[in-house]
Curated annotation (Swiss-Prot):
It is a single-pass type II membrane protein. GO terms for biological process: chondroitin sulfate proteoglycan biosynthetic process; glycosaminoglycan biosynthetic process; positive regulation of heparan sulfate proteoglycan biosynthetic process. Residues 38-63 are annotated as: Disordered. The active site is at 98 (nucleophile), 396 (proton donor). One of its GO terms (cellular component) is Golgi membrane. The chain crosses the membrane at residues 7-27. Keywords: Glycoprotein, Golgi apparatus, Hydrolase, Membrane, Signal-anchor, Transmembrane, Transmembrane helix. InterPro entries: Acid_Pase_AS, His_Pase_clade-2, His_PPase_superfam, Histidine_acid_phosphatase. Residues 1-6 are cytoplasmic. This is 2-phosphoxylose phosphatase 1. Belongs to the histidine acid phosphatase family.
């Protein structure tokens, strides 16, 4: 009897479930054939992850400024010295921007930032080579100095920094950069032997103490305790490093046009104008006076050194100044935002690129000629005939047009202690290559702050990286420097481009 009751109960429950299932299907509350519906959605049953289309993050002027400061406590990384196996490093040409410096301008009615420019290994930031670097600079009289460089101080020397003076932060950053390239080129590739010859090292700088001192700090990191008697430091009289080829009227006209574009862009920026008015009112000066003082230069120094932004020095109270009488991070962010906007507009306008091609050509031409001599000397088994390592210690106004001329406008404005590197490599020679004097086995790499940008350059953007030769042929660079780069200004040579009419 009990078993019969259980059987009847099971039948009733089963019937109820059947009716419920039929009802749901009839009312389309569940799919009748989920597998078939899945198949009808597409031929492939492979799971496809959804692609989220999100807008790129908005530019952050404060984050970008941290990168510009180039703090020396950041670990140095880079792809310098990396190449396929069996390739040989023949030469390295480096341009650096000077390191962190004291402002070139002062903001009216504010106190200058208090920064000690006398070097001390006991003060941060420091470096294991700093103490020996200080001692080694005292022996600089044994070196060979071009023009007026011998009279410049080889170390920063003021307890309160002077205008434009290199800071200890700048020195330490250059020591680190030089040490990084020492590991990449000397430890790994033996680019310069311990008994290197004077003609194998080329060093040049402008007549500013900050570029001379930056170059010496970099060299000491690269060649610790180098022999002064083997070093000659040459002076470039122009910040463009144009040597004997500085006469270029068209270049100056392009620069005038670009500066007028910059001015129009600034005065059209309503937020920037309101910010200048507010800053001027805060300090009690005329707006045009504040704008002429280029306040971003001094504010960058405060920001990079973690100092409070300047306040009006006309406070009557000896206590801390009122917050309303001080410049703020918000003021600074607006100015930096406008500078980033200007970089984008400058790229679109194209005027700066034309100026840059003519400004950078003399330096690029000398570098190209040096690399070609070294390449041909290597083919003819003539070694140690030219500078296998060349250093140019320069300014932002030197490096910025160089980047633009190379087609690297997206690389950004040169930060403190920025470095631009040209590497010359040779691949293993075949029997066919040994019989001719072509440069088919010579290649170039271009690196900016450690990042390989070779295939972003104008002369190697179209090179097939998946070809039998994964590097950029040196011939591409030589052709670019000697002719192709002038297509931007509708010319075929430097002389023609410099003396044509600019409307």
């Amino acid at each position: 009897m009990l078993a019969r009751s259980r059987f009847i109960l099971v039948l009733v429950v089963g019937a109820l479930l059947a009716v419920l299932s039929f009802s749901l299907q009839y009312l389309h509350l569940i799919p009748t054939n989920p597998v078939a519906e899945q198949r009808s959605a597409g031929r492939s049953r492979k799971r496809v992850n959804p692609v989220l289309h999100t807008d790129p993050p908005a530019p952050d002027p404060i984050r970008d400024t941290h990168q510009y400061c180039n703090y020396p406590n950041l670990t140095e990384h880079g792809w310098e010295g990396h190449c396929p196996p069996d390739y040989k490093l023949l030469s390295v040409q480096v341009m650096i921007r000077h390191g962190d410096r004291f402002p070139l301008y002062s903001i009216p009615k504010t106190k200058k930032p208090t920064i000690d420019c006398i070097l001390s290994e006991k003060r941060k930031p420091s470096h294991p080579l700093l103490a020996s670097f200080i001692s080694h600079m005292a022996l600089g009289g044994r070196g060979h100095w071009d023009a007026s460089l011998g009279s410049l101080p080889r170390l920063p020397s003021h307890s309160t920094c002077e205008m434009g003076e290199l800071t200890q932060t700048g020195v330490v950053r250059q020591l680190k950069n030089g040490d990084h390239l020492r590991q990449a080129y000397i430890s790994r590739h033996n680019l310069l032997a311990a008994d290197w010859l004077p003609r194998q090292l080329w060093a040049e700088t402008t007549g500013k103490s900050r570029t001379l001192q930056s170059g010496l700090a970099f060299l000491f990191g690269f060649l610790p305790h180098f022999d002064w008697s083997r070093l000659t430091v040459r002076q470039q009289w122009s910040t463009l490093f144009c040597g004997q080829s500085c006469d270029c009227p068209a270049r100056n006209r392009y620069l005038d046009q670009e500066q007028r574009r910059q001015y129009r862009q600034r005065i059209a920026d309503a937020e920037l104008e309101r910010t200048y008015v507010t800053m001027a009112k805060t300090l009690g000066v005329a707006t045009k006076t504040l704008r002429a003082a280029n306040p971003v230069d001094a504010l960058l120094c405060h920001f990079c050194h973690g100092l409070p932004f300047p306040c009006s020095s006309t406070q009557t109270s000896s206590n801390a100044p009122d917050e309303g009488a001080c410049l703020t991070l918000e003021h600074f962010a607006v100015i930096r935002r406008q500078q980033k906007d200007d970089e984008l507009e400058r790229r679109e306008a194209g005027l700066y690129r034309r100026y840059a091609v003519l400004a950078a050509h003399p330096y690029l031409n000398r570098s190209a000629a040096r690399l070609e001599r070294i390449a041909r000397g290597s083919q003819m088994r003539k070694s140690k005939e030219d500078a296998v390592f060349a250093l140019a210690s320069a300014h932002d106004v030197t490096m910025a047009p160089l980047l633009s001329a190379l087609g690297l406008e997206g690389a950004g404005f040169p930060k403190f202690a920025a470095r631009l590197v040209f590497e010359l490599w040779s691949s293993p020679e075949t029997k066919e290559r040994r019989s001719d004097r072509k440069l088919d086995n010579m290649f170039i790499r271009v690196l900016y702050n450690g990042e390989d940008l070779t295939f972003d350059t104008a002369f190697c953007r179209e090179h097939n990286r998946r070809s039998t030769q994964p590097l950029c042929p040196l011939g591409n660079f030589l052709s670019f420097v000697r002719k192709d780069m002038f297509s931007v200004v509708n010319a075929t040579s430097y002389q023609q481009a410099c003396h044509q009419t600019v409307l």
